[in-house]
Amino acid sequence: MSMQDTLADMFTRIRNAQMAKKVQVEIPASKAKEAVAKVLKDEGYIAGYEVTGDKKPVMTVELKYYEGSPVIEKIARVSRPGLRVYKSAGEIPKVKDGLGVMIVSTNQGIISDRAARKANIGGELICEVS
């Protein structure tokens, strides 16, 4: 059986690895997952990521901890295959009053909520991270 929501699988793998105190986690790679990982790295939620392999690329995500506890408290899918959620730039919600980040898929790529508001572009709300 094929996987329907690969981004939700990525978030679940990250969540499970952090609960198990893993240093890194391997995820089947795709361009969308790579773009999400770039936003997570830019926002300081992960230490880094690397894509290896040609036929079946694998992305290794290095997780980040602060004083022994995971930096990512919550990572949850917002828009899903059964219920897509689109918002304009002004309607994009703030996560934890600006302390968290909403990852948005726009026509200019996958970016953070702050970058989307600054560029005044809306899009599909992929996930919220705090």
Swiss-Prot record:
- Which keywords does the record carry? Ribonucleoprotein, Ribosomal protein, RNA-binding, rRNA-binding
Q: Which SUPFAM superfamilies match?
A: Ribosomal protein S8
Give the CC-aspect GO terms. ribonucleoprotein complex; ribosome
Q: Note whether Cell wall biogenesis/degradation occurs among the keywords.
A: no
Q: What InterPro entries does UniProt report for this protein, alphabetically? A: Ribosomal_uS8, Ribosomal_uS8_CS, Ribosomal_uS8_sf
Q: Any idea which GO molecular function terms this record carries? A: rRNA binding; structural constituent of ribosome
Protein's UniProt keywords contain Translocase: no
Function field: One of the primary rRNA binding proteins, it binds directly to 16S rRNA central domain where it helps coordinate assembly of the platform of the 30S subunit.
The protein's matches in PANTHER family, at most eight in alphabetical order, are given as: 40S RIBOSOMAL PROTEIN S15A
> Could you give the subunit structure recorded for this chain?
Part of the 30S ribosomal subunit. Contacts proteins S5 and S12.
**Designated name of the protein:** Small ribosomal subunit protein uS8
Native species of this protein? Alcanivorax borkumensis (strain ATCC 700651 / DSM 11573 / NCIMB 13689 / SK2)
